């Protein structure tokens, strides 16, 4: 199914992610998480006290000043409650003015949480379209149009990518940066809905995703996109 048109499919995505997470988590693991609607849905399938594991859940993105249910801090606390583990909180906004970033990153409580996130055994993160995330960050219409015109299709960790995974634009955001992902043993990307196909493609092309949990809407769209690219290559060769 397609999360964009069938609400039940987003639930299925949450169920599949929860099942996989329970399968791979080991006692002693550090689980790093981001926020967003998809990960909030995943947290729904970890009822309080349903498990008993020695894990630590860490939010690795600051807050975007929106619905508290989809903040990384809330997702981390809810997952930890369901897993029977511990959690830390990242008391910081997602985006800060460039001149204030270093000062904020040197604040001991923020620095310690981000350092713990960098040592994660597993990272679970959502993915957004470039337009959706620009709107959530409060970009004005002109800036959004400029971003789209420059080829940006997806966003993760404050970076906006084109379909080949090239960085088009990056924000001064608090939390994990792209280079940190290379050192994390298992990076799980979760995102569904046909509208996110290009965004998923961008993250896969970047090469930092070990496991991608998605839906039929994205999978079918990606297969058709690959077909189009192959067709173009064949035309070019002939």
What is the predicted role of each segment?
Residues 1-32, 43-52, 63-69:
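HTH-adjacent hinge/linker in prokaryotic transcriptional regulators
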Residues 33-38, 192:
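Glycine-rich beta-strand-to-loop/alpha-helix junction loops that act as flexible
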């Amino acid at each position: 199914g397609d999360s964009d048109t069938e609400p039940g499919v987003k639930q299925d995505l949450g169920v599949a992610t929860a099942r996989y997470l329970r399968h791979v988590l080991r006692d002693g693991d550090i689980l790093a998480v981001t926020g967003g609607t998809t990960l909030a849905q995943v947290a729904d399938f970890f009822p309080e006290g349903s498990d008993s594991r020695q894990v630590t859940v860490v939010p690795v993105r600051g807050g975007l000043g929106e619905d508290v249910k989809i903040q990384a801090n809330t997702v981390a606390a809810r997952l930890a409650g369901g897993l029977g583990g511990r959690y830390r909180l990242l008391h910081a906004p997602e985006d800060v003015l460039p001149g204030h970033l270093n000062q904020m990153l040197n604040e001991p409580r923020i620095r310690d949480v981000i350092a713990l996130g960098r040592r994660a055994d597993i990272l679970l993160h959502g993915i957004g379209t470039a337009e959706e995330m620009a709107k959530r960050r409060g970009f004005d219409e002109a800036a959004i149009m400029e971003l789209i015109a420059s080829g940006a299709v997806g966003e993760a960790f404050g970076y906006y990518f084109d379909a080949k995974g090239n960085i088009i634009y990056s924000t001064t955001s608090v939390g994990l940066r792209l280079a940190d992902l290379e050192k994390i043993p298992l990076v799980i990307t979760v995102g569904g809905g046909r509208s996110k196909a290009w965004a998923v493609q961008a993250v896969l092309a970047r090469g930092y995703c070990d496991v991608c949990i998605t839906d039929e809407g994205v999978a079918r769209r990606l297969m058709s996109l690959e077909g189009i690219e192959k067709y173009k290559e064949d035309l070019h060769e002939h």
